């Protein structure tokens, strides 16, 4: 659900996300807010847990390395922009000449002009606040320690300040994006395990936690999870979502409505994950068992992808892992998820 007042407060105007969580900022032409025809130019994501591992518990060193990686990320993003400088409208007529991007350029017009001054966003992403805190401080769970919560928030604020500076320097609408990490959760962790070995609380699970989200194994109620995550969207207003995991609550819709009402004044964008799986062999409807090898009907054991329907929200959007399986890291993360009600 999109909570109107919070979307306006956090992003500057009301709009729906692009994809699962990418939000544009406010942009006006001739005094009128424009949303249609705008776009994001791409994302470069930072592996925060790796930086924390390399810092070896030294917070000052962590921020020194982080600033080095930020400079590299900016260079990569500016390279994306540079590739557009001499691109002509004729390379994609539907986008640039027929109105899909809100303009009707001539064939030999440069397209770069329509991405400037905040019309298009370009984003810095990040992954693994949970593992970063574990690697850097070794002081318990971030949820249970107010000091660690503040450390996590401060890291994201540092990233947010960086993109604000880039925007002031370049005129392009740099934004901070809480990377969905459907693939990066597996890839970054796998690369770090290969280089640094298995580290408790960091690389030992086979995946990194999605952006700023609470550890999927932490058993809390949906209200407390909202309170934990609500500090991040205002900092990462180029991309965000908060969500809760629920059992089948068709007979207790008032409870779900109560959570939605609670979310309204706290977060801009909230997802409700409830089981809607179905077995075409025995007729079972509910929640399939998630294993390292896939999803299985709890009633008859059926796991034939052609005879089941499985739906999961992963990284902000709904997918069908029976038809398009997750990578090993994301499958493990989904398997470890606990219910918040």
Across the structure, where does each feature detected by a protein language model lie?
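Conserved catalytic cores of very large enzyme subunits
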Residues: 1-118, 139, 145-299, 303, ...
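Short loop/turn segments at secondary-structure transitions that flank enzyme active sites
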Residues: 49-54, 130, 135, 182, ...
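Contiguous, well-ordered alpha-helical segments that form the cores/surfaces of helical PPI scaffolds
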Residues: 122-135, 157, 313
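Glycine-centered flexibility sites
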Residues: 125-128, 238, 316, 329
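Generic structural signal for hydrophobic core residues of well-folded globular domains
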Residues: 132-137, 248, 263, 314-318
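Long insertion/accessory domains within large nucleic-acid-processing enzymes
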Residues: 301-341
């Amino acid at each position: 659900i999109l909570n109107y007042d919070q979307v306006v407060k956090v992003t500057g105007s009301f709009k729906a996300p692009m994809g699962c969580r990418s939000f544009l900022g406010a942009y006006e032409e001739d005094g009128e807010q424009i949303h249609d025809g705008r776009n994001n130019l791409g994302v470069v994501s930072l592996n925060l847990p790796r930086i924390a591992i390399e810092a070896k518990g030294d917070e000052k060193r962590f921020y020194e390395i982080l600033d080095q990686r930020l400079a590299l990320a900016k260079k990569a993003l500016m390279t994306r922009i540079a590739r557009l400088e001499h691109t002509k409208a004729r390379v994609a007529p539907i986008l640039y000449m027929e109105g899909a991007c809100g303009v009707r350029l001539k064939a030999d017009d440069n397209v770069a002009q329509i991405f400037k001054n905040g019309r298009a966003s370009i984003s810095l992403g990040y992954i693994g606040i949970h593992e970063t805190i574990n690697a850097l401080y070794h002081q318990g769970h971030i949820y249970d320690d107010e000091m660690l919560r503040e450390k996590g928030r401060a890291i994201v604020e540092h990233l947010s300040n960086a993109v604000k500076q880039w925007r002031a320097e370049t005129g392009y609408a740099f934004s901070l994006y809480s990377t969905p990490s459907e693939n990066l959760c597996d890839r970054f962790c796998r690369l770090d395990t290969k280089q640094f070995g298995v580290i408790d609380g960091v690389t030992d699970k086979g995946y990194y936690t999605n952006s700023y989200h609470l550890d999927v194994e932490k058993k809390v109620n949906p209200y407390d999870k909202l309170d934990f995550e609500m500090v991040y969207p205002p900092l990462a207003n180029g991309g965000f979502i908060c969500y809760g995991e629920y059992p089948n609550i068709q007979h207790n819709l008032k409870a779900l409505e109560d959570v939605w009402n609670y979310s309204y004044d706290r977060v801009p964008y909230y997802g409700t994950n409830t089981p809607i799986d179905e077995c075409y062999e025995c007729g079972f409807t509910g929640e399939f068992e998630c294993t390292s090898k896939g999803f299985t009907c709890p009633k008859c054991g059926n796991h034939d992808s052609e005879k089941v329907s499985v739906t999961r929200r992963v990284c902000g959007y709904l997918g069908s892992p029976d038809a398009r399986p997750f990578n090993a890291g994301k499958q493990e993360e989904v398997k470890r998820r606990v219910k918040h009600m």
